[in-house]
């Protein structure tokens, strides 16, 4: 059973190799959007999957880890590096790391705990609701990013916009 979890790492290795191709073909905005949409889909799959007939949804959700992580976090790091310029690269990466792995995770874990507590029922949890909450949130971020993200640069040091 635990071997199935390696699907996430395997897919991450594959999608990291696709990242440069995606930057050239669809640009940074749509690469990031693909990652955001994959997060939403992943949470939906976890919400509706189960250990019986819906196990394929859980396995697909695990396999989506690669596109989720690489097309969102890694692509964001590459974009930040390209936009920051030589003088501010280290500071920009430090700020991004603080925002995502520091404050972002701290706030995310607190919110996840509240959501899990909110959907507690008779010694268990309404897991579908627990998973659909972040799915909806990720989709809302996807829509906001689609509408609001604008980068005036045509190209950012080899990263197509």
Language-model regions, residue ranges each:
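Loop-to-transmembrane helix entry
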Residues: 1-13, 56-57, 128-132
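Helix-loop junctions at membrane interfaces in 12-TM secondary transporters
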Residues: 47-61
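Loop-to-transmembrane helix entry/capping segments in MFS-fold secondary transporters
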Residues: 84-97
